[in-house]
Amino acid sequence: MKLPIYLDYAATTPVDPRVAEKMMQCMTMDGIFGNPASRSHRYGWQAEEAVDIARNQVADLINADPREIVFTSGATESDNLAIKGVAHFYQKKGKHIITSKTEHKAVLDTCRQLEREGFEVTYLAPEANGLIPLATIESAMREDTVLVSIMHVNNEIGVIHDINAIGELCRSKKIIFHVDAAQSAGKLPLDVQETKVDLLSISAHKMYGPKGIGALYVRRKPRIRLEAAMHGGGHERGMRSGTLATHQIVGMGEAAAIAKADMEADNARIAGLRDRLWNGVKGIEETYINGDVEQRYCGSLNVSFNFVEGESLMMALKDLAVSSGSACTSASLEPSYVLRALGLNDEMAHSSIRFSIGRFTTEEEIDHAIETINKSIDSLRDMSPLWEMFKDGVDLEQVQWAHH
C-alpha cells in the first residue's frame, strides 16, 4: 500500500494508464504530432482525424452533437467563456445573472468581474443541506435576467443539483442556463438531449484525463451565441482560437470513452468504499456529514469532527492525502465559504475534512484511513480543553471568552 493514501479525487485524478498510452502516440515524429489545422498534408489530416474522434467521444459522454463541443484549457476557461460570453453577447437583452454562493471560484470570480463591468448578479444562499430549491431560483428571476449558472455536483460537499428541473424552469422563462459539470461529467449520467442545459463546462483532469484541457458544450438548437474571449485563427468555430493540443484532446476523448463505459461499475464500487469509510468513522462522537445525505455523488464525503482544529487534524492525518475545502482555496486558512454558506459556524467549518474516493482507491486503503482517523481524533481531543469542557456538560455557546 502506497502512503500517503490518495483520498483527494475531487481535487484531481491520476491519468488512467490507458489514457496516458493514447496520449503518448500523439507527440513524437513517429506519432500523430501534426497541427490539426494544417490542411495541406497528411500530418495535419491525421491530427485532425484524431481530434474529430476525441470530439465525438466527449460528445457521446453527454449525448451531444460533436459540433456542440468547444475545446478549452479546462473547466475554469469554460466557465469564463460561458458566463462572460453570454453576458457580453446578450447584454442588450438584460444585465442580470443568477448564481449560487456555493459555486466554484471560477464561476464566482467571473461574476464578480462582470459586476465591475456594470452587470448585476444575484448570489443565492443554499438550504442547510447545500441544495438550492427551485422556488428560490424562480423568485430571483426578472425580466432582465439573461443567465442562470448553477453547478451540477458541488466540489466540496458533493451534493447534486436537479439540473433537469432548473433547465425546464429556465427554458420556460427563456433564460440561458449554464452548468459547471466539472465534478459530474464522467461520473454521473448526463444527457443534453433530455436536460435543457444550454452551456456545460467539463474538465478532463477530474475524470482521469490530463490537466490543461477541458470543453464547453454550446447548444445549437435553440442556438446559443457567445462573444469569444480568445481571438486569433478562428479555431473552434471562432469561439476559442488557438492551435488545438492534439495529445491533450486525444487524452480527454479516451478518458470520456472509458468513463462512459465504466461509469456504472466504477460508481457501484466507489459507493461501497464511501459507505465503508462513513461506517468506520460515524461512531466517533460529535461527527457530522455536511451536505444532503441522499442527493450526493457517491465518491464524496465531507465530515466535520467537532472540537478538533482542521489544520491540526490534517497534520495528524499525514498518511492521508485529504483536504479541508477545495484545492483551489485550500491555500487560504479561511474556513470554507461553501460550509459557511450552509450555516456552519467557523469552528465546525474549520474542523471539516473532505474525503473523495475514486477509481484506484482500494478497501485496504479505506480500512487504513478509518484506523488513522479514529486514532487521530482521540489523541487530538485528549489535548483539547474545549472537548473536556463539553464532556463536563459546559454549554460552550454560553461561555464568555476573555479577549486579550
UniProtKB/Swiss-Prot annotation:
Q: Which cofactors does this protein require?
A: pyridoxal 5'-phosphate
What is the phylogenetic placement of the source species in the record?
A: Bacteria, Pseudomonadati, Pseudomonadota, Gammaproteobacteria, Alteromonadales
Q: Does the keyword Magnesium apply?
A: no
Cellular localization per UniProt: Cytoplasm
What is the scientific name of the source organism?
Shewanella woodyi (strain ATCC 51908 / MS32)
Q: Which family does it belong to?
A: Belongs to the class-V pyridoxal-phosphate-dependent aminotransferase family. NifS/IscS subfamily.
Pathway noted in the entry = Cofactor biosynthesis; iron-sulfur cluster biosynthesis
Name of the featured protein: Cysteine desulfurase IscS
Residues bearing N6-(pyridoxal phosphate)lysine? K206
How does the record describe its quaternary structure? Answer: Homodimer. Forms a heterotetramer with IscU, interacts with other sulfur acceptors.
Q: Which Pfam families match?
A: Aminotran_5
